Amino acid sequence: MNKKLNEVLLKLDQDLIKCVKGSLDLEISGVTYSSKLVLPRFVFFALPGIHFDGHDFIEIAIQKGSNVVVCSRDVDFYSPNVTYIKVDDFNIRKFMSNFSNIFYDEPSKKLKVIGVTGTDGKSSVCYYIYLLFKKKGVKVGFISTVFFDDGSGSLIKNPYRQSTPESTEIHSFLSTMVKNEAQYAILESTSHGLDLETARLIDVNYFAVVFTNIGHEHLEFHGTIQNYLNVKLGLFRSVSDDAGFGVINLDDLYSSDFKNAVKKSFTYSLKSSKADFFVSFIDEKTDSTRFEFYHKGVKYLANVSLLGSFNVENVMAALILVSQILNIDIQDIVDKLNCIKSLDGRMDSINLGQNFSVIIDYAHTPGAFSKLFPIFKRFATNRLISVFGSAGERDVEKRFLQGQIADIYSDLIILCDEDPRGENSMCIIKDIAKGIVNKVENKDLFFIADRKQAIEKAISLAKAGDLVVALGKGHESSIIYKNREVFWNEQEVVKNAILSLEKSEKEK
């Protein structure tokens, strides 16, 4: 895609631009904030950051062919034939989003964009909506923590560490969806992505939105639960189309706030018959869940190959969204729920014939812990052994809560790394341990920072009928430390630990 720089700038808020040095009569062919991704005639945004400053990479970007640099401070050397656009630090991400949106011809206006937000369940709800659309033969694109689909029908793993990519990638991906003739786009809309400070989603035109729940997460970024809530409410307030609507979990404490933030909404509940969709009965099996729900006085019977009442909530959100946006009969969607399957790293059972069970799950919040641990306890015919950590440079307050919940249900706990980043691993572990009051260190509570060794310890301690749960990583392919990122595959680590145990037992 090629555009004239001046044509793009004419459509932007001129008040955001402090000054321009160089020609505006330039052809540009792309937009990026990463010097690694720069190609000839790319606009390079020098974003300030916590660990890296884009201004330090301006020369590299120019060497690779960038002919336009957007910066928030004066640079040491101005290259001829390069245009420099200066904006405020605070506005540079907003300007990048505005610029990307215009450069890619406002792609979200050519799609019906569905945003899913909440503390827990976002990725699963996005995936279930995607699967139901596909089952109905609808062309759809998809951006989530785990998977992407650019509208071509092919799922790829999310290539970014962020659930919601930067605005340059969002609008580029939406543009590709338009080219691939997708009708709908599903966006996992995180609080980081929705926040005005990151400005990743501010130029996305949403048609329908889903709210799952609010819990204790990301307060290191938002400061207070009210700020966190307001960011998510902003998504609902952004729905301007008269035909647009919201889908809301009525069981959440903040559901009324979300109802008030959107003109039209549909609610679902596992507790209240006042909801538009009320789940009145749930029967959990070891490999599936059967449930019934009512809508406008009509009873529907459904069955899914998923575990847990929390997944019934997720399925209901997807079912309502798809039936309403496509304006089709509820029973039509109920009949197609057999297409729904578990997302990678969610309630992922590892069975190599061992006499104990192992489940891997991405759960990393107190809310997710409170929903999953009762299920784990029911599944464990003997002891429950839990392996988990908590993210470094993230919400510190949740660590105590994670430990507290795990302590109630677990027989043994092994604390380890999740993503320590720049924090000391043992400091994080001890923060979690403050919530664990019913365990004794080195008896039924172990501190093993190395996650591989922690999992191996759990597997070595497992006896017949035990359930080992490894939480917090799920599908993720790396562990982040201060100055390095280490490849990680939880499934392979667990499998290797089981095989090593079996080998050592045979050699005895």
Swiss-Prot record:
Keywords, comma-separated and alphabetical: ATP-binding, Cell cycle, Cell division, Cell shape, Cell wall biogenesis/degradation, Cytoplasm, Ligase, Nucleotide-binding, Peptidoglycan synthesis
GO BP terms in the entry: cell division; cell wall organization; peptidoglycan biosynthetic process; regulation of cell shape
Listed EC numbers: 6.3.2.-
N6-carboxylysine PTM positions: 232
Molecular functions per Gene Ontology: acid-amino acid ligase activity; ATP binding; magnesium ion binding
Residues that bind UDP-N-acetyl-alpha-D-muramoyl-L-alanyl-D-glutamate: 35, 163-164, 190, 200
Protein name stated in the entry: UDP-N-acetylmuramyl-tripeptide synthetase
Organism, as annotated: Borreliella burgdorferi (strain ATCC 35210 / DSM 4680 / CIP 102532 / B31)
Gene: murE
